[in-house]
């Protein structure tokens, strides 16, 4: 169900409805990201010590994101909206390549591949929805173009299996983390902008 048909001039979906859809989508993406990470972790990461190496190794670490609800509440809604947009945009390339490269993992289960495809598609939808929300909240502003470029493709193609699996592990770990943050930020923004912070 598209948020508004592309090119439609008189899209009458309310801001509240746009936020409802964005929150549902972000929740779904986080659910899928968590499931995919857990499945990969159980199948490929056991006994390899990946978790100790994965700390702070995300490609968009340069985007300063609030760590908790209290920090997020200190940020102006326009900045928080742009931050969500930046994080979503920073995932376009990694998700696209994840779909391709995950097929090359030895005995990769179909469930992991399906989730990678689904997350990539839903991330695009959420990005479109966020651009519409920003267009309503800040008319004329399409959000800043500040987002982190990803340069991790070579690490997903390494010949050394351990190194390659760690690159996947790290990417999925970061995806789960970021999808959780986006889910929380959108709930906070919806509360602030739609319910006047009464939630």
Curated annotation (Swiss-Prot):
Gene3D superfamilies: 1.20.1250.10
A single MF term (Gene Ontology): hormone activity
Intrachain S-S bonds: 4-11, 58-174, 191-199
Location in the cell: Secreted
GO cellular component: extracellular space
BP GO annotations: positive regulation of cell population proliferation; positive regulation of receptor signaling pathway via JAK-STAT; response to nutrient levels
Glycosylated sites: 60
Signal peptide: none
SUPFAM superfamilies associated with the record: 4-helical cytokines
Keyword field contains Nucleotide-binding: no
InterPro entries named among the record's database cross-references: 4_helix_cytokine-like_core, Somatotropin/Prolactin, Somatotropin_CS
Pfam families cross-referenced by the UniProt entry: Hormone_1
Major place of residence: secreted
Entry keywords, A to Z: Disulfide bond, Glycoprotein, Hormone, Secreted
Post-translational note: Glycosylated.
Family listed: Belongs to the somatotropin/prolactin family.
Name the UniProt record assigns to this protein: Prolactin-1
